[in-house]
Amino acid sequence: MRITGTEWEKGGINENEAIIFAQELERIGCHYVCVSSGGNTPNPKIPIKPHYQVHLAKTIKENTNMIVRAVGMISDPKKANDIIISQEADMVAMARAFLSNPRWVWDAAKILNHDIKVPPQYARRL
């Protein structure tokens, strides 16, 4: 389920309320949340920058036992890997990264020094 970690504005959902909501979701059987933010109040002051929502996922992960996915301008393979390794989140979502670079997975594998096996039909494009 996708939840809001904060609305970035007074009167909207804040981080403490997001924790309570996530804990209630877990209590009734939810096993996974994707933590986003903003978009439900009229004038949020969203600090848009790379990884700006990762701390929200980390907060939910620290306060539940659910699988948590982080979002928020995650495009750098090393940072995406660091988010997982540091247990800030269990998964990362990178929609815009894939839209701007359909070869993101291959490029990330090279950057992170992962040897991946590919069918011969695709190898010529790497």
Each model region followed by its residue ranges:
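Flavin-dependent oxidoreductase catalytic cores
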Residues: 1-126
